[in-house]
Each structure stands twice: as structure tokens, then as C-alpha cells.
Amino acid sequence: MTDTTKIDYSKTLYLPQTEFPIRAGLPQREPLFVQRWEEMNLYKKLREQAKDRPLYVLHDGPPYANGNIHIGHALNKILKDVITRSFQMRGYNSNYVPGWDCHGLPIEWKIEEKYRAAGKNKDEVPINEFRKECRELASNWIKVQTEEFKRLAILGDFENPYTTMNFHAEARIAGELLKFAASGQLYRGSKPVMWSVVERTALAEAEVEYHDIESDMIWVKFPVAGEVATENDLSGSAVVIWTTTPWTIPGNRAVSYSSRIEYGLFEITEAENDFGPRPGERLVFADKLVEECCAKAKLQFKRLRSVSAEELGKIVLDHPLKGFGGGYEFVVPMLDGDHVTDDAGTGFVHTAPSHGREDFEAWMDNARQLEARGIDPNIPFPVGDDGFYTKDAPGFGPDREGGPARVIDDNGKKGDANKVVIEQLIAADKLFARGRLKHSYPHSWRSKKPVIFRNTPQWFVYMDKNLGDGTTLRSRALKAIDETRFVPAAGQTRLRSMIEGRPDWVLSRQRAWGVPICVFVDEEGNILQDDAVNKRIMDAFEKEGADAWFADGARERFLGARAGEGWTQVRDILDVWFDSGSTHTFTLEDRPDLKWPADVYLEGSDQHRGWFHSSLLESCGTRGRAPYNAVVTHGFTMDEHGKKMSKSLGNTVTPQDVIKESGADILRLWVMTTDYWEDQRLGKSIIQTNIDAYRKLRNTIRWMLGTLAHDEGENVAYADLPELERLMLHRLTELDELVRSGYDTFDFKRIARALVDFMNVELSAFYFDIRKDALYCDAPSSIRRKAALQTVREIFVRLTTWLAPMLPFTMEEAWLDRYPQSVSIHAEQFRPTPAEWRDDVLAEKWRKVRAVRRVVTGALELERADKRIGSSLEAAPVVYIADKSLSDSLEGLDFAEICITSGISVSDAAAPEGAFTLGDVKGVAVVPERAKGEKCARSWRYTTDVGADPEFPEVSARDAAALRELQALGKL
């Protein structure tokens, strides 16, 4: 007989055993996995493993190689990493080639700052020496960012990334430009572009942001020209315009009106102002706006008559500066314009084609008719690249006493241009009124200083030129948008509206660090079309990089025998958006491990006007379609209160800090649980919420590992599995569909939420809780225990592989704990799900079982709260079920086991008054009762058969049988 007084029953239980730590220690542990993956060259192993699978390509939008990564970079790269990993684990060869955008102004600025600190003059430094320093700076930052991305567990070909400054890349970018030139899409023109005086360069729309500023606003009188106004009584009157840019008045060439607006002729009857209109003056306004304008100028008025659009179209005006500075003697025509409204102002728009896109378009639309009327259609250049007026602004430019006035100075401060123009308008008695206005105004995203619209000679790509097949670049791009999948769908509308309304594409920048516009032109601006010259350029760039264009003797080298023909070498460089828009050519097309077009591009929502946009135009212009099949967009990261992160506000969260304090997997979990396509929030409390969620997840994984330490790999036939195990396998089937669908649609939050809920609600609080008794206490030969181990094994494999793309460090740690000889969880595939696991009938039955169970657990929670019981095993409640479908669902089940009680009774009798109920489960009531019998010293269940086996008098018959079996195996 066994001496039971010497048995430590806890040592007879199959309790979880694992070295998987409860404390993650991610900041210390994660770098070890980074090192492991590096040493084993995991990326290369995955390529070899998947070489015969279909390719899936996410093309990396290149971050700028300048500075440490910020939270936006982390969000972006994590999303990309999850996509590439998930497709790899679903049977694809999912390559990821990281890239960097290397040219452009920010890097030039860094070198120029260094020069200024050293007292060097950039203009005295040979251009290729300057470019060399830019290249070195970009290279250094690529190294820094590479390590930062790896620390986030970004898996990619970091040994062979792409960069826009690579010699081959520069050659291909130049080649793409030459394709536009050869097809006639590239032209030199002059247009008003957004110009940064501070940076001395034109800016693309993507390089501009808007901030509120306070500006001068003026109302200006344009007299009706006397010699053409004799046929009606508008003679001697004036048309009044309103503008917030007084400095553009010297560039005025027309006044626009709208045939949709009602206008009138008004006479001033009283005036209380120090300057401006006097009684008797007659002025033309939009009827809707005259009262507001005259109130501003402290005037009383009366309406004389209506003025028709037809009448306005026949008159011309005098320039308000006529007679000043020996210029402005030309007439100012009236143009009918769709852009004119009577929402604000006067109903007339001051039109300076040198200084506004709509002004330019209105002027060019009428250029032919204006020339026929004897009006010079040429557009002046009133403001230079330094913000000073030129000779095209007589009286304000170099001919002005004291030198030219300036719009904006080198520091981005307002110059004296507004002041001197307003003074001259007052002197000429052409100022109607003046004031100040706070409004949104464009600023350079880099310098944060205001920009101006100024007419400049630039290189453009036509948006609306017939490309020989009846299409235009615009029509091709719009068609491509319709053929592209957008996530979220609103991105399609956004990009379409931008393409529909955009002007011709400005390609040129007047800077040094970039790929040159490598063409030669004659005096008229015609581009040299010579295949031999182009080949010499391309060959040189391939071997030496784009520096070859700026080397001494480059013109003669490339032109060869044509050097004496008078061709001029263009010195401008390409907009960096053309660089990044061309990345598909030297990555997707040129690399054998990739393919064109890409399956997906993923970037922030600002890239609808940036990389998505430029890539679309570049590819449609040279290949007729988009370089991508799908576009996924994410929002921006705000602080936890929804405010924009700012160093000045002290509310920034850096990925480096989160990783150092909590680990990269915490940051990745945050990304996975946000609505990333919208703006997200991040701060200390949100990070803590994710830490708490991670701990629960980790504990669930840890429990499974501990339980599976006793798993000998035995399988029970599906038909022999208990219902509870079959229910869990059914749930795995449902989750498998959800996970695969979620990864397909990039809906990561849906996956993360479903898996976390499954682990917390269905595993920890339900299945595992129920099965702990069988797993810990049943005999080694127990079918129930073997079935539970088998099911936990299936759950573990699926959960860890499903979560591996999201939490690569933690799932690798768990996988190697379970399978120490494995290469990596990231070399695994999502497991196929047997069709027999799906059982919708069983799931519906258990929906009812769990409903009844909720009423029981609710009743027992009250008993515990009132300290009538300490554990549910002390209870044997009576359950009254009036709904037959609910009682039928319990047939054949050990409902006490499911409720984790030592006993349970089910009755169809009427429930006694005071029985516990839940409002959402009709027809079920519970009366708590204490369990009968004695407490088993091993399982702690109360049974009436404790001591039935005299050799083990302290335990139940089930536990005694288990002990006998352990004894026979020599484990007792």
C-alpha cells in the first residue's frame, strides 16, 4: 500500500513547464534575434526557399537619406514588413528591396550649413566637389537608417538596396528623361511656379505646406481706357479689384470677370476716407459685393445701372501704374474667366500671369485673340530668383532710386515691395482701400518660409499633348487610376482629382545635387535629338554617375562632332520627384528578383501628391500604365490627444525611445491595432495599453508552451475528438479565413483584434480554463487529455504563424522554444486547414451552450463576491432551463466540467423566485448550491468517490486511476 502522506500531489500533475520567460525583456532580447537573423542571412534563406513560388512585390517608397528615422518611418516600414512577411508565409516569394531618396535640397542644405560654419562660399566650390560631399552625407545616413530599420525587425535585402544616387540609377533616371524628350513631351517654357527665395529653387506641390499669415490687402481702381469707352457711359469710370499680394500689381496684364456674375455701375455719394474715391467717382463692382467694399472704404454710394458681361468684354483698362517709371503704358484687357466668383473681393480678379496659375491659364487661353487685338501676349519676369524686382517692373526694379524693391529676403522675411507699391498707388490716386487679412499661405516644407509665384524659365512635361495614339499623359493617368486598387478606396478619388486639375509637370530645379536635365538646346529652346549623343551621356552616367554632366569639357565630350553647332548645355537638375517616380525602372524592371509592375505601393496619404503621383505620371508617360496594381495609404501619427507632434510642444514620440523602453514588438503591436489608414494617436498611455495587451498575449503563448512540454505528439482521430476540441478546430477554420482575408485586404487591425480576442476570451477564459483539469490531472492514457494536447498544439502552430508577420521577435522566441531545431518561424507557412474541421452545426449548438454557461458563471461570481464560495469547484448549482432548444444543446455533455464546477443539475421545472438570471439569456435561471462530497487532494474537485481506492484515500477515483498509471510508468 502506498503511503499517501508522503505524496506531493502537485508533482503528480502535468503542470505547465517552460523556460519561456514571463517577463519579455524585449529591449534586451530583440537585438539577439536581429543578430541571429543577420548571421544566418535569413532574407537570403527565404529567397532560396521560395525561388520557385510566384513573386509578390511591394515596391518601397524611398525615405529621404537625411536624419534618424521618426515615428512616421516606423509606422510605414512596419506596415510594409507585415505585408511582405504575410505573403511570404502564404506561399509567395515575397521580396522586399529597401530604397533611399538621395538627391535634393535637404542634403544640399546640410552641406551649405557646414560651409557657412567654416566660412566657405558654396559658389567658389567646384560643383562636383560639392556633389561628392552630398553623396557622402547621404551614404552615411543610409547606414544609420539601415540599422534603425533592422532594429524594428524589418526584413529586406539591406545588402543590396536601391538608391537614387547609384550610378546605374542616375543613368536610368536620365534615360527616362530622354524618353520624354524624344516623344516630344518635354518642353522649355515659362510659367509661374512656386518659388522659394530662401532656397533659390522652384518647388513641387508636394514640397509645399500651408500656414496662416497676416497679409496686406488692397482694393485698386483700374480706369476704363478713354479712347475705347466713348460708346457708353463707362467712360471715366473704373473697375475695382481686390488682392492680398500688392507686390504683384506691376505684373498685372488683365482683369478677369465672370459672365455668371451680375455687375453694376455705382457712384460715390459720400466719402469719409483720407485717400481713395471722392464723391462723384463712378466704379464698377459685382452687385453682391459693393456694399461690403464701400463700407471698408467708408463710402456711401448709389447704383446707376447694371453692367452686362458683354459690355465688360468690349472695354479695356488703363494700368493703375500708368505713367510711373516710364512703363505700364499698355492697355489692360478684360477676360471672361471661370475662376472668378462673387464670394469675396469685388467680383473682378487682378490677373498677373507671371504670378498665379489661374492668371497664367486665363492669359494663355486668350493669347491668340489678344495678339489679334494688338495686345502683346508675352509674359514678363517682374521678380527675380532673389526676390528683387527686375527691369520688367519699371520704377520698382534696378531703375529705382536706392535700388530694386524686394518681395521676400534671404531669411524669408517680407521685403519692402508691398510698401512701395501701395505708396505709388496712393500717389497715383488708384488705391480704393487697404487692410490686413489673416489667411492660409504656401510655405516651403523645408525652410518653413513663405514662397511666391513667379514666372520662370523651366522645363515641363505636357499633361495634355496628344502622344500620337489619341491619348495624353493626363488621360493615360486617369485611365490607370481606374485600373488600380486603392486601400482605402477614397485614395482613388483623391488622386484622380489631383490629376484632373494639375498643370503641366515642372521638372526643373536650379540646384546642384541631383540628376541633370541632360539635354542640349538651340537658341529657340529646341532639344537636340541625337541617339549617338544620348548614348554617350547614358554610358558616361552608368560608369561615372551624373557627375559626368558637370565635369570640365562635358559639352564637347557628349556633343562630339556637333560641338561646333551652337548647342547649349542645360545646367538645371531634375525635381527629386522625377527621381523617385522613376524608381520602378531601375528596380522593378532591372532587378531579376523583382517584377514590373509592382503588386503594391504603400505610403502616407501625402504621397497622393508625391510618390504615387510622380510614379504614375512617369510610368504613364513612358509605358502607358501605372507601375503598381494597388496603392495602400496610411495616415499620420498624432500625439495621444490628437495634436500634431512637435518638438516645440514636447509631445513627440520617437521609435528609438519606445524600442529602448518597451521593445519593437510593442511598437509593432500598436501599428497593428490602429486604424492605420486614418491618422493615429500615440503617447505614454497608449503605449501602456499595448504593453498590457502584449503581456496577456505573451502569457497565453507561455501557457501553451508549458502545456505542450508534456506533448508526445500523439493524435486522436477527428471523429473521436470531444465536442469541445472539435469546436476549437472549427474556430481555427473561421480564424484561418479571417486571417488570410485580412492579410489580403491589408486589414491588420481586424486580424489583430480577432486573434487577441480569441486568445483572451475563447482560450484563456474558456477553453484553457475548462481543459486545465484534464490536461493537469487526467491519466497519461486519457483520450480527453491527448485530444486537448493535440488541439493546443494546433492552436499554437496557427496562432504563432499568423502573428509572426506582426510580432516577429516574440513569435520567433516562442517558436524556437517549442521547435529548437527549426530554422525560423519566418521560414514556415500558414498551415492548411482540413475541410472536416468546419462544423457550423456544432458551432451553433455551442453558441447555446455558452449562453447557458454565462448565466452559471454569473451566478457563481456573485457567490464568490459574497464569500459564500472560494472557488467554482465548491459549487454544484441547479440550472433551470425553460427553453428546450437550450436544454437540448446540453445533451451528452458534462456540463459541470464546462462550467468548472464539481457538479451541476439541469431542470426543466419553473425556476424558484430569486434565482439568478441574465437579461440577454432568456429562459435560464440558476440557483447556487454547494457541492456534495469531499475535496480531492489532487484535483481539488468535490466528489462522492474520494477514498474509493483504498491505496489513495485522499483522492477521487479518477485521480487514483491516474496515480496508479503513473506508478506503473515509474513516474510516482
From Swiss-Prot:
SUPFAM superfamilies cross-referenced by the UniProt entry: Anticodon-binding domain of a subclass of class I aminoacyl-tRNA synthetases, Nucleotidylyl transferase, ValRS/IleRS/LeuRS editing domain
A Pfam family reported for this protein in Swiss-Prot or TrEMBL: tRNA-synt_1
Extent of motif 'KMSKS' region: 644-648
Any single biological process term in GO: isoleucyl-tRNA aminoacylation
Chain residues that bind L-isoleucyl-5'-AMP: E603
GO molecular function, one term: isoleucine-tRNA ligase activity
Record's catalysed reaction(s): tRNA(Ile) + L-isoleucine + ATP = L-isoleucyl-tRNA(Ile) + AMP + diphosphate
Annotated Gene Ontology cellular component terms: cytosol
Binding-site residues for ATP, renumbered to this chain: K647
Keyword Methyltransferase in annotation: no
Enzyme class of the recorded protein, top EC level: ligase
Keywords: Aminoacyl-tRNA synthetase, ATP-binding, Cytoplasm, Ligase, Nucleotide-binding, Protein biosynthesis
Motif residue range(s): 'HIGH' region: 63-73
EC assignment: 6.1.1.5
Assembly notes: Monomer.
Domain notes per entry: IleRS has two distinct active sites: one for aminoacylation and one for editing. The misactivated valine is translocated from the active site to the editing site, which sterically excludes the correctly activated isoleucine. The single editing site contains two valyl binding pockets, one specific for each substrate (Val-AMP or Val-tRNA(Ile)).
Function text: Catalyzes the attachment of isoleucine to tRNA(Ile). As IleRS can inadvertently accommodate and process structurally similar amino acids such as valine, to avoid such errors it has two additional distinct tRNA(Ile)-dependent editing activities. One activity is designated as 'pretransfer' editing and involves the hydrolysis of activated Val-AMP. The other activity is designated 'posttransfer' editing and involves deacylation of mischarged Val-tRNA(Ile).
Family per similarity comment: Belongs to the class-I aminoacyl-tRNA synthetase family. IleS type 1 subfamily.
Protein's UniProt name: Isoleucine--tRNA ligase
